[in-house]
Amino acid sequence: MATTTQNTSRTAHLLELMTKGDNAFNARDFETVDMVHHPEMVAYIPGLAEPIHGSKAHSAAMQQFLRSFPDLHTNTPYPIQFGSGDWITVVTNATGTFTGEMVLPDGKVIAPTGKAFDLEFGQTTKWDGDRLIVIAAFYDTALQAQQLGLA
């Protein structure tokens, strides 16, 4: 069993890696983002019927999201952050403006509205060493749709 000091040190290290990954995403430094993500990662994203398997598929999904919201930004530092062992949770806000087409999983295309969202955004993540292997993201998709003029 890990001691409190070991657990606290591990949590602090993982929070640093998470911040590094989100700051790299905000800077569109995808080489650094890819170094943080495990090749066999799984991502659970609100609104998707199935999880995303693999870092390449996750990267492709994020690129599609950025085509819809080119100014997408995840705020750091995280106002809420905690963890235990290989798991951490961070809660912050994410913002973006709907200025590019959105392609739904069924192929339907939604034209941009030019409206912005500002949502509480959280992620619970599991780490394998220094690589993120599970992401469970959470945010209010109904509120996002309302803010974007889609509901």
Question: Positions of the model-derived regions?
Answer:
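C-terminal and inter-domain tail/linker signature
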Residues: 2-151
